Amino acid sequence: TPAPTPSPTPEPVQTTPPPPPPAPSAENWIDEPRTPGDWSYRADMSGGEALYGPRGGEALFAIKCDRRAGRITLLRSGRAASSTSMTIRTETVDRTLAATPAGSGSQQVMATLAASDPLLDAMAVTRGRFAVETTGLSTLYLPPWAEVTRAIESCR
C-alpha cells in the first residue's frame, strides 16, 4: 500500500495585535477627573460673572448674570451648529437646554435660564462637581466653588 501523501503545512498567518483598549472611564460621571482650571469672579454693573479656565487663559465656561433681565447665561467656549444642546448634570438634576452660538462667528455657545431656575441651585451645591455636555465639544467637569454661587446670587 502506498504511503499517504502528506498535506502541505499551512503558512502562519501574520496578525496585527489589536490596539490597546481605551482608558476606562469612571463608572459614574461625577467621579471623572475635574477639568483643569480655576474659577474667578468679576462684578460689573449688570451683575456678576464666574469664569472657569486655565490661569491667564481663555475661559472654558462662564456663568453670567443679567440682573435687569433676571437671567443667567451659561457660556461654553467652542463652536457649534446654529442650534445645539447643552446638558448640565448635577448630583440631583440633569437637564438639557437649548443652546446657540453666542453671536455671529462666536467661539462660544450659550444657554439662558431665569435667575430663579432651580438648576442653578443644583449647580451651586452639587457634591464634587457638575458636568457641562455640549454637542460636538468635550465634556467639562467643574467644581461648584464659591464663585458659582456668587454669580448666581448676584442676579437674585
Annotate each predicted stretch with a short phrase.
Residues 60, 83-85, 129:
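Exposed beta-strand and adjacent loop surfaces of beta-rich binding modules
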Residues 47-54, 70-76, 107-113:
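Generic recognition of long tandem-repeat/solenoid scaffolds
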Residues 55-57, 89-93, 135-136:
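Short strand-coil-strand connectors
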Residues 1-45:
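Compositionally biased, proline/threonine/alanine/serine-rich low-complexity intrinsically disordered stretches
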Residues 40-62:
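Secretory pathway targeting signatures of secreted, lumenal, and periplasmic proteins
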